[in-house]
Amino acid sequence: MQIDHSGDSSEASQAHDSKLHHSHLLGNIPLGLPEARRRVKILVSVDFDAVSGWMGTGQHSRNCLSDYSAGIFAGRVGVGRLLKILDRVGIAEKVTWFIPGHSMETFPLETKAIVDSGAEIALHGYCHEDCTQLDPQQQQDILDKCITLAESLTGKRPVGFRAPLYRIDHDTISLLERKGFLYDTSLSGHDAQLYYLDSGFPLDVVDYSKSASTWMKPSPQPRQLSVVEIPANWYMEDMTPMQFLPNVTNSHGFVSSEAIEKMWKDRFNWLWNWGPDGSGPGDFVFPLVLHPDTSGMAHVAGTIEGMLRWLKEWGPQVEFVTYEEAAREFLLDKEVPA
């Protein structure tokens, strides 16, 4: 196209040509930068504590039938409600259930329904024991018993473990490695990435009766193990803020489900924008820890379903996977055979 500038002043002509040139340059600039691609794994887990939670870490001399009935609710009501929610959302077979041996044997029909849903079955003690209160032989006996129970239910050896109440010690870690477990999920060394479990820092507490020079020294670096660690911490779970346990010191019970949902969404949004290292978009994992005792309650269940649907709405860059799937993919990425 030829522009006739005859009759235009030289200054007007130059201005017109400048606008055309500027317009041409803008036309070559994309309207928006493409969104960074990432792969986000949603790891939904359920701890089927039920009555076992009151027998081990939750035991107290003041506990009574009223307290135990909350565990009965978890088994007889909460499990069914959660299974239906997970089925409606379309992720039932992508969930990992951590089931104490006591729950497997006390609620066999509910446990069978979990297995039939296609979910992964992992271990969580027998009576929700505090591993730090057990000697090595007790820990081994419990683990062996629970492995046998899980194998009888699924026909498959379990590969994952979560310490009840996250109470884990060096003996537990050594036992998991000796027994060939693929992963543990009891520790908080990261909140959005898998990593190799290590043998644990040998921490010596300060002894104020001695000279300061006796404790002013760094901790020895622990040995890296072959077991994968999948993040867990108190801010990823439902029970502590939303379930009142009268004789458990860290329970609250009267935090609204909307407050917890907001916290989880805030965490996801930050990771989506800034990635696990805070430098920008990147791949990350997003674990959630639910309980039929808590998320099975009527005033919480709707929020849980809404949260899961919200996560699904993020599209193909977000996928729900079992803990086993996430751990095996981590090993493949590290080029270490599982």
Swiss-Prot record:
Q: Which InterPro entries does the entry link to? A: Glyco_hydro/deAcase_b/a-brl, NODB_dom, PgdA-like
Q: Which residues form the NodB homology domain?
A: 65-257
Q: Which UniProt keywords apply?
A: Hydrolase, Metal-binding, Zinc
Q: Which GO terms describe its biological process?
A: carbohydrate metabolic process
Which EC main class describes this enzyme?
hydrolase
Query: Under the GO molecular function aspect, what terms does this record hold?
Result: hydrolase activity, acting on carbon-nitrogen (but not peptide) bonds; metal ion binding
Question: Which residues does the annotation say bind Zn(2+)?
Answer: D49, H124, H128
The answer, when asked if Endoplasmic reticulum is one of the entry's keywords, is no
Q: Does the keyword Metal-binding apply?
A: yes
The induction field says: Expression is positively regulated by the cluster-specific transcription factor FGM4 and is induced during infection of coleoptiles of wheat seedlings. The fusaoctaxin A gene cluster is silenced by H3K27 trimethylation by the histone methyltransferase KMT6.
Deleted gene: phenotype: Leads to reduced virulence and produces significantly smaller lesions and fewer spikelets with blight symptoms on susceptible wheat cultivars.
What is this protein identified as? Peptidoglycan deacetylase-like protein FGM2
